[in-house]
Amino acid sequence: GTGVNSTKLHYTQGAAQLTGGDLVLIDCGAEYEMYCADVSRTYPVSGMFTPRQRDVYEIVLQVQKTLERLARPGMFLRNSEAQDASLHHIAVRMFKDAGAEGHFKHSVGHFLGLDVHDVGDYSIPLSPGDAFTLEPGLYFPEERLGVRIEDDYILTEDGLICLTESLPKEVEDIENLLTHGEEIEA
């Protein structure tokens, strides 16, 4: 969705017109040999982020990068009983510390597999071989501003393998791609 629709978790109508100054949030799934992927990216319609959009985007990106570094066997995607080991609760705290409390409206991620939102027991710690997303986001409907960055991962003994790392998500890479058509080497 674009504009205020970028603040809706799963905007499906696709009827809004893209307007310069707005963001467009794309949440897409794919399937390969019966296994699913789920990826979200947020792009500035004009090709360049406004200062406010950039600030919000960078907060979301920093949360995702922190979760990527922290994710390891024994952590949880979400678990209210083990908040210090819960990636979701870590994201909530980081957003609160950034002054964005209450603007993160969904879980930090979900399991992937034969379904895009695959079954998984969130009360059991993550273990090597688990496939899941990390998708922090912030949503400000009053500003027509929604940002979500979602990537797919496999957990190993040593941390994460990002299956979607070739998709640009750094601000400079996105702006170069949109304004100059420059592809970035992954």
Regions found by a protein language model. Give the residues of each.
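Active-site neighborhoods and metal-handling regions in enzymes and metal-associated proteins
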Residues: 1-186
